[in-house]
From Swiss-Prot:
It catalyses: 1-(5-phospho-beta-D-ribosyl)-ATP + diphosphate = 5-phospho-alpha-D-ribose 1-diphosphate + ATP. One of its GO terms (biological process) is L-histidine biosynthetic process. Its cofactor is Mg(2+). This is ATP phosphoribosyltransferase 1. It comes from Geobacter sulfurreducens (strain ATCC 51573 / DSM 12127 / PCA). It is found in: Cytoplasm. Feedback inhibited by histidine. The gene is hisG1. Belongs to the ATP phosphoribosyltransferase family. Long subfamily. It is an enzyme of class 2 (transferase). Pathway: Amino-acid biosynthesis; L-histidine biosynthesis; L-histidine from 5-phospho-alpha-D-ribose 1-diphosphate: step 1/9.
Amino acid sequence: MSGLLNFGVPKGSLENATVELFRKAGWQISISSRSYFPGVDDDEMNCKLIRPQEMGKYVERGTIDAGIAGRDWVRENESDVVEVCEMVYSKVSRRPARWVLVVTRDSAVQKPEDLHGATISTELVGFTKRYFAERNIPVTVEFSWGATEAKVVDGLCDAIVEVTETGSTIKANGLRIVCDLMESVPVLIANKAAWADPWKREKIETIATLLKSALAAEGMVGLKMNAPNDQLEAITRVLPSLKNPTVSHLFNSDWVSIESILPEKEVRRIVPELIKLGAEGIVEYPLNKII
């Protein structure tokens, strides 16, 4: 029995990367600048554009059945949802985001305890309050509407809690990271009632499997070739494969067909070696998913 899954697509910085990930996983999501309701080529899905900061509360309520948001915002809102899986991707890289405690470069602060009685500015107010309360460090945490880094530079606060991937922008602005408070990646979350529904759970699990397989395929390619049977062992030693390469004997021949999956960046290094070992008909092909 089929049904309809209400799915939240994160609006903002994760939006384009999420749509592209779904495309690689097999779904075409089309977003219009005039609508908050993206089209999707799946009659069993209804998509809505929702800010990651609000995704957790809507999933918890059951307004939507499932969606993608940063784990940081799920924790910020203390959302009571099912975390189905995590997926490491962002608008610019494939690395986790970090929420860091930041001060000016010449600040005397070296650790969180040095901020006793200080004022901290951040978008992540709830988490930051809990972080310092758990360590019995009295601070005042203020919500920042933006330009958070400028506030500590201008002396409007003593420190900030800000999100970064590399820390390069923080350093470029004359600031210093005291420590990391939390690492965050996008997570697929589900409403508990939806997760208890057999059809919706299977649909959500299918989405999770295909999204993860699309991420797993990034930077990977397939390589196949024909080679003399007596060079098989030498060639398989050269090939960096997820598992052992697939080998098939060619009909009425002392040659074999070899197929392997490997990082794309390795191809330029190993192809000359394969040719020296007698490989012929080498074909490289892209991968959309590795399941």
